[in-house]
Curated annotation (Swiss-Prot):
Keywords: Cytoplasm, Cytoskeleton, Microtubule, Phosphoprotein. One of its GO terms (molecular function) is gamma-tubulin binding. It holds the Pfam family GCP_N_terminal. The gene is Grip75. InterPro entries: GCP (IPR007259), GCP_C (IPR040457), GCP_C_sf (IPR042241), GCP_N (IPR041470). This is Gamma-tubulin complex component 4 homolog. It comes from Drosophila melanogaster (Fruit fly).
Length: 650
């Protein structure tokens, strides 16, 4: 009977536990003394706990599909390895059962109490495993979060349980470090269940989910959209383990993205064509990342393997290994970007065209474009790109403009298709950056540059048109000597020009020059690429903030031409609208009879809006310490002309 009881200790199916039914019959009295029945029931309880654990390992560890298809999403790769770890931890329990079987077979007289005492020594281990499985099911733990839960339980007061949890965690830990090594060194993630803390989210995903996205799917996305490919990888916050900080996860993401950039296309430029090694490297396939690692990938791989071989996760050593790999990758990338690609010159071109640094070019472009905007809408989109090319030819900068092209985006939701403002909002620049600057100019970054570009182009275009008002009024006064110049038009024109000139000076000098100088100092110091990347992000954020192109939460860009949350920007839009109406009103061939009344209305509207702008700037300045904003306020209202006229205290 005891041997049957020991056989039941290995059974994983509670339905086939015949020894339990034996207790419900009267035959049990012939084999077990009534005093031992309680001991017998306690052994049954131990067996039931074991069966709960064994059922989990059997259901989670089996192959759910024998035809090579993807398994059920409920059985992830980490759960599979958890089942393997539990099976490994149960080996000690199985060994004890085997020892008891040999002992009982070798002795004629066996005690049920002896069997119970031997099994009870393993009971805490079984209960611990059952509680662990229950917690995983209740909290729905999976992936890296599951590993974090196991890591938290490593520091255990019971030596037996501490040893067991390390055995259980080992396969799960190996799976984690395997994914980490493949991402860091090869830029590969084969994560069909989204269990890793780096995930791939294709741009055409409906719900933003990365489930069922394998490495094959990501490669197809790379071929379809190579420019946006690396930015489709992001930190999966739902799977970020607690022992991994967000900053450290961003470093891991950066390293993997860098590897992807090298795999997608190195485009090695051979400066010394007589060097056979350099020529050979230039002929290598784009999937070769030798230029990045320089043969040190085995060294870094061994560092990750050593982390995996430790009994527990050494958080401090893990952080040090990742930082060492990141520093090496960042230094190599900085060396290539600064020396081979000439990052300083690339940023100079960005400033010249996105930030309107080439004043003579954009003056000529405005001259060409203003005539284009007077045509019908369909002709505008056809002619504006031609105006851009003509301006480059006239100013002799065609070579510098090779990497830039003007794009016209047609919007069907515009409230007024004839509005110059809405037409300007459809313009954007496309920049063909050189490899490996993919990591610096993401699609989001280019879109932010285009927001600044459109904002500056609007100011520059209205400056040109308001200047034409003065030229036309002066020409009329000289050509018709008996008709004096309209003082109301000239006065309002001076007000508008004063506003536009100060806005342009504030943005170009107080904001762009100072912030761009800080960025260039970082680049010239030849810092590692992550520092350059961070400085570039700060540069863009500061420029957008000082140009009032961010809303109050500074998380979303204002959609120009629509309702927004930034009151300063909304006031600027109204002032731009006044500039546009004034330019059209005063330059028509047949002005209306009530032109002066319309000018008076615009003058009054301008006074209200400029006073509102000054008051908003005063409020913002008092709530912050923005130096450039103080300069703008001082220039706009240096003699309190506008504030005194509209009872606004500056």
């Amino acid at each position: 009977m005891i041997h049957d009881l020991l056989l039941a200790c290995r059974s994983h199916n509670p339905e086939q536990l015949g020894i339990k039914a034996f207790n419900e019959t009267t035959v049990i009295d012939q084999f077990i003394h009534p005093c031992e029945r309680e001991i017998f029931m306690d052994i049954i309880k131990i067996i039931k706990v074991y069966q709960e654990v064994e059922q989990f390992t059997h259901s989670s560890g089996r192959k759910s599909d024998t035809h090579g298809e993807l398994p059920d999403s409920l059985h992830g790769y980490y759960l599979l390895n958890l089942a393997k770890g539990i099976e490994m931890a149960l080996e000690e329990y199985y060994a004890e059962i085997g020892r008891l079987e040999k002992y009982c077979l070798g002795n004629e007289r066996n005690s049920l109490s002896y069997v119970y005492n031997a099994l009870y020594a393993k009971f805490p281990l079984l209960v611990f495993m059952r509680n662990l499985i229950t917690e995983i099911h209740v909290l729905n733990l999976r992936g890296c979060v599951l590993l974090h839960n196991l890591h938290q339980q490593c520091e255990h007061g019971d030596i037996q349980l501490e040893k067991a949890i390390k055995i259980i965690m080992k396969p799960v830990k190996n799976a984690f470090f395997s994914s980490l090594a493949h991402w860091l060194l090869f830029g590969v993630i084969d994560d069909v269940h989204s269990e890793f803390f780096i995930k791939f989210t294709p741009t055409d995903a409906v719900d933003g989910s990365s489930f069922s996205k394998s490495a094959t799917c990501s490669l197809l996305s790379a071929e379809k959209n190579p420019e946006d490919y690396i930015w489709q990888y992001e930190v999966n916050m739902s799977q970020l383990p607690g022992f991994f900080s967000i900053v450290l996860a961003e470093k891991v993401l950066f390293v993997g993205q860098t590897v992807l950039v090298f795999k997608m296309g190195r485009n090695v430029k051979v400066k010394n064509k007589t060097d056979p090694l350099a020529a050979k490297l230039a002929e290598l396939d784009s999937d070769d990342i030798y230029q990045l690692w320089s043969g040190r990938e085995s060294e870094f791989f061994k560092m990750v393997v050593d982390l995996s071989n430790e009994d527990t996760i050494n958080v401090f050593r893990l952080e040090k290994v990742i930082i060492d790999i990141k520093n090496y990758v960042s230094a190599r990338l900085s060396e290539i970007a600064v020396n081979e690609v000439d990052l300083e010159r690339q940023m100079g071109l960005i400033k010249d065209f996105f930030l309107l640094g080439r004043g003579e070019f954009y003056l000529e472009f405005c001259s060409q474009m203003v005539g284009t905007m007077e045509t019908y809408r369909e002709e505008r989109f056809k002619n504006v790109t031609r105006s851009f090319e003509l301006a480059a030819t006239v100013t002799g900068i065609t070579d510098d403009l090779d990497k830039f092209s003007l794009i016209c985006q047609r919007s069907t939701s515009e409230p007024d298709d004839t509005s110059d403002f809405n037409f300007l909002q459809g313009l954007s620049l496309k920049y063909e950056y050189e490899w490996p600057l993919n990591l610096l100019f993401s699609p989001t970054t280019i879109e932010r540059y285009n927001n600044i570009f459109r904002f500056l182009l609007i100011i520059r275009t209205y400056q040109y048109e308001i200047q034409r008002v003065w030229a036309k009024q002066t020409w009329r006064a000289k050509s018709a000597k008996d008709v004096p110049p309209n003082n109301k038009i000239i006065t309002l024109r001076n007000y508008l020009m004063f506003f536009l000139n100060n806005m342009q000076y504030y943005i170009q000098v107080d904001v762009l020059e100072s912030q761009f100088g800080i960025l260039m100092n970082v680049i010239k110091s030849r810092s590692d690429f992550e520092v350059i990347q961070r400085a570039h992000t700060v540069f863009l954020a500061n420029v957008l903030s000082h140009c009032f192109l961010l809303n109050e939460s500074e998380t979303q860009l204002n959609v120009t031409g629509s309702q927004n949350r930034n009151p300063i920007y909304g006031t600027l839009l109204k002032l731009f609208g006044i500039c546009e109406k004034f330019a059209h009103m005063t330059q028509t061939k047949d002005p209306s009879d009530d032109l002066e009344d319309e000018v008076d209305q615009l003058n009054e509207s301008f006074g209200v809006q400029i006073a509102s702008l000054i008051q908003l700037l005063v409020d913002v300045k008092s709530a912050s310490c923005l130096g450039p904003l103080s300069q703008l306020l001082l220039r706009l209202d240096f003699n309190c002309w506008f504030s005194a006229s509209h009872n606004t205290s500056a």
